[in-house]
Curated annotation (Swiss-Prot):
This is 3-phosphoshikimate 1-carboxyvinyltransferase. Its EC number is 2.5.1.19. One of its GO terms (cellular component) is cytoplasm. Its main location: cytoplasm. Transmembrane segments: none annotated. GO terms for molecular function: 3-phosphoshikimate 1-carboxyvinyltransferase activity. GO terms for biological process: amino acid biosynthetic process; aromatic amino acid family biosynthetic process; chorismate biosynthetic process. Belongs to the EPSP synthase family. PANTHER family: AROM/DEHYDROQUINATE SYNTHASE, PENTAFUNCTIONAL AROM POLYPEPTIDE. Monomer. It comes from Mycobacterium marinum (strain ATCC BAA-535 / M). SUPFAM superfamilies: EPT/RTPC-like. Catalyzes the transfer of the enolpyruvyl moiety of phosphoenolpyruvate (PEP) to the 5-hydroxyl of shikimate-3-phosphate (S3P) to produce enolpyruvyl shikimate-3-phosphate and inorganic phosphate. The gene is aroA. 3-phosphoshikimate binds at K26, S27, R31, S170, S171, Q172, S199, E314, H343.
Amino acid sequence: MSSIEPWPAPFAPTPVHATVTVPGSKSQTNRTLVLAALAAAQGQGSSTITGALRSRDTDLMIEALQTLGLRVDGTGSELTVSGRIRPGPEARVDCGLAGTVLRFVPPLAALSAAPITFDGDEQARARPIAPLLDALRGLGVPVDGAGLPFRVQGTGSVAGGTVAIDASASSQFVSGLLLSGASFTDGLTVQHTGSELPSAPHIAMTVQMLRQAGVDVDDSIPNRWLVRPGALRPRHWDVEPDLTNAVAFLAAAVVTGGTVTITGWPADSVQPAKNILDILQTLNSTVRHIDSCLQVQGPQTYRGFDVDLRDVGELTPSVAALAALASPGSVSRLAGIAHLRGHETDRLAALSTEINRLGGNCEQTSDGLVITATPLRPGSWRAYADHRMAMAGAIVGLRVAGVEVDDIGATSKTLPEFPQLWTEMVEGSSG
């Protein structure tokens, strides 16, 4: 799954002009899979999904649901979810490095009447999970362990009620609980008790999709969500293109002064990555909506910038690459992203290490990065088994000849086609 040989990042000596089609949203795909599984588990019937992303993260979610006894049929991006929660003996869920599997599936497993063990990649064992497990214990679910590996011992039902949780390390703690809340006997009220919540738009996505499944959710009070018990409606889900994956391609237009068009860009989306457009416009880029496409025309030059990425932390590696390639001497400040230290890798440490390895100037702050743009030199860019880090290295390689990404295969986590799409884009033939 990971490349053994370093990947020479394509260099673009002239502006990139290309049209790119990116596959479905990972965030939406894994939420639709869980919602479809819950509807089926309630005996409401099967659901279908069109446009599903097929990547390591989504395949791990499919395998997790199958481990729980549910059926996920279909090939490619067309899926059908049916069945009930009936795990076999010694059921074991492999979370890999997928935060959505790690945090969305345990509440679902709590509805089982059998023990289910969770484990994952070595790096996943450092990802925050204890607050979610403590929340499940607070709801009466027996859980052994404070991190991977751990075991959820369901009793066939969860009473529900009110739970307080510090989700300042990950909004997925809240989303994971909310997704299963309507299947709890008394529903669920989640109260966030910690400091400012990161990636709040991802919780808004969860709430919107729950409502689309017929669930009554009250989010009228800040940092509190009430999910009333009830049936989840089986339905057809149509997954949008993954706007977060599209960001790297849009960044290519900015750093080369070219034009990149993304097909199928939704007119109205709850995906937080849509906020990248505001950032790109501050960099003197021109953004156009043309029919169902989004087109970004990059500037001749752009200077450093200040941006709070608290709600869109997933964009940080791509935005950091943009900052490193700004006009020499200009300074960018990326804030609101302390929680990235608990992602696939410590992304703040990784970004500062890799930018500085190539001769850049990147310093960590308590909640972000300060990047002073300086001419970069060729060299190796480590991905740390992190898909976003690998993509950031590809962006840098567009303007710095001789950059090699040590593990471009890490992009298989959310976009297995990335190396091909990227190369085709640089050649101007992607579509």
